[in-house]
């Protein structure tokens, strides 16, 4: 088993996935750096506003571009990433995104005008600013996936994990010097205009050098096909984003921005586990797809067993560390964030239990069970909404954590059960 894992690591270094993982971990470190700078220089309500808008961009941005950052590689990869395919798909996706962007802006404009949303003026202002910039946010995400299709993976991941935070870092530097710290959220929002323009320039320059020849079998995808393929993926992606964002939306509604900040800090600490699970999942993704297509279920069992052990042992090590040093970790962000210590402990235990389910997400995705995955996550979102409505008003931060844990356990273990019934493969971690 370990020789196979060693082989996977060597292959990962050779095909740049090691460097991709390095950049993704760098992205997590940047998230912690921005959180540290926020929590040590701004009031908790400002930190909460930042985390609320960050979640808003994730969910609404994915909706208006129909999760093209997830689907674009499929749409152009079918024709070997040929030049004319990239141009055609890129133009169609930008058109769809722009139409939905305008529609989204008008809907919120009408809703706020007639007071359909019961939010304060600060939140309303933040949402409308974000709606104005959403198109640029989507352009940036679409651009970096095109860069990946052009085989500039390193450039793509650098934009995703490092350059994305540059406007915010400039904001920290300039505003603290000028004494206008209350403008920091604007740097985050409007920074996506700069990133969209910069990524577009880089994409244009690199695309000029791209010479992959015309594919004689190429047939232009119509808008109907793009919608038909993208909608199920959008359901899965938005549902997944909602699972990590609904708690924040409800905490903001019931308790305000400061509670969003307290919860988000704990949630970001636990995000290290998610990064590790995703990295392990990516390292075996192609092997899962290949062996499933061949019908080699013995090989599949070996892959899921080895990845399940890696996921569990990493989760256990990290969770134990967090449980022992939870107070020390939270105090780094400021004494007021110690209020979320019990929340951090709950999330750690919950994620450790979830890690027993192994690599459920990637297995379903790579074995042609994407629709099942989408339905599972969507059901988990509904459960999460109901639990949040019941638990958050009474238990605040702990209620949000419990809701999140139950939802995650639901879709992971139900997914593992479905895999066992369908493929006769036990994807759960086993000690032997």
Each language-model region and where it sits:
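Transmembrane helix-bundle signature of multi-pass secondary active exporters and lipid flippases
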Residues: 50, 54-62, 236-240, 244, ...
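Membrane-water interface segments that mark the loop-to-transmembrane alpha-helix transition
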Residues: 16-27, 53, 62-112, 125-126, ...
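Signature of the first transmembrane helix
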Residues: 11-69, 73, 133, 228-258, ...
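Interhelical loop/hinge segments that connect adjacent transmembrane helices in multipass membrane
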Residues: 1-13, 121-122, 178-191, 200-244, ...
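Helix-loop junctions and terminal segments of transmembrane helices
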Residues: 64-81, 149, 270-295, 301, ...
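Interfacial segments at transmembrane-helix termini and the short loops linking adjacent helices
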Residues: 9, 14, 46, 112-130, ...
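Hydrophobic alpha-helical transmembrane segments
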Residues: 128, 158-209, 379-383, 397-420
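Membrane-interface junctions at transmembrane-helix termini in multi-pass inner-membrane proteins
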Residues: 75, 137-159, 349-376
